[in-house]
Amino acid sequence: MKNILIIGATGQIGSELTMNLRSIYGNDHVVAGYIKGAEPKGELLESGPSEICDITNAQNIADVVNKYNIDTIYNLAALLSVVAEGKPLLAWHIGIGGLWNVLEVAREHGCAVFTPSSIGSFGPGTPAYKTPQDTIQRPKTIYGISKVTGELLSDYYYNKYGVDTRSVRFPGLISNVTPPGGGTTDYAVDIYYSAVRGEKFICPIAQGTYMDMMYMPDALNACVQLMEADPARLVHRNSFNIASMSFEPNQIYETIREELPGFQMEYQVDPLKQSIASSWPDCLDDMCARKEWDWKPQFDLHSMTLDMLEKLSARLKA
């Protein structure tokens, strides 16, 4: 039975991944790591163990690993893309300094490590359509630079020390549970909230700007599936392209209007978000993930929209 530590367990991905992993491996086998000021609440707190686990403090991480006999670490501590641009030193301190701490603890204690990368690891020189698994990256944001560095550092620890590091490059993630928190792709979450509330949506991303997106249930499955994959099949480790759907703002708007014909949207482009979005690929080629660990998403734009509207409507009425 795995003993898992999730660092950043109260964040956008971590809060849902923690509950998902507890449903698979048992509540007592998944520790929710958090920092002061971001304590777990409700079911996340009550369903299993939680510990302060500051990624910038290697001894703190080691203490939690020892206490719970941890063998697998999901490292989800990071600043989101737009937030990171306003706090570049902090973004690097958490994203790279913190990752180094995690990898050192993993090396000393024999832990496997999952540290997600992102479509933000690519830059304007990257082939935009069907972005290959192995290609030029050269991102222009501190978020992307830290993601590329994290990929390389994780591979270094695997090649030099044998640490079982694995990773995926997440597209923009869309959740019906966790509210948006400052990412470039978060417009694709905000738009559903506006639709369910009967409000006009003000879109910060220009029409025609395609980005890869993924529904959170598929993202959670990818995390688990990759960490359970046979290591003998893995040619790539850090980090796999994974894809589900690619769309631009008007497409998601029209898909919502099929269910809510009165929904309205107008564009007020945010220059910072747009500059970041324009530097990212339109869609990724994920054939390596499909070949090496049988990756296959379950949701497309239409099925995600139906589920988002249903789940958000029920939640906002409760």
Describe each PLM feature range.
Residues I4-I24:
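N-terminal Rossmann NAD(P)H-binding glycine-rich loop of SDR-like oxidoreductase domains
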Residues Y25-E39:
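Conserved glycine-rich Rossmann-like NAD(P)H-binding loop of the short-chain dehydrogenase/reductase
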Residues L45-N57:
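Rossmann-fold cofactor-recognition segment
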Residues I55-I94:
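NAD(P)H-binding glycine-rich loop region in Rossmannoid oxidoreductase-like domains
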Residues N75, W100-I142:
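Conserved Rossmann-fold NAD(P)-dependent oxidoreductase catalytic core, especially the SDR/UDP-sugar
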Residues W92-L99, S146-K147:
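Short alpha-helix in the Rossmann-fold core of NAD(P)-dependent oxidoreductases
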Residues D155-Y210, M216-L220:
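NAD(P)-dependent short-chain dehydrogenase/reductase
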Residues P204-A206, D212-A318:
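C-terminal substrate-binding subdomain of Rossmann-fold SDR/epimerase-dehydratase oxidoreductases
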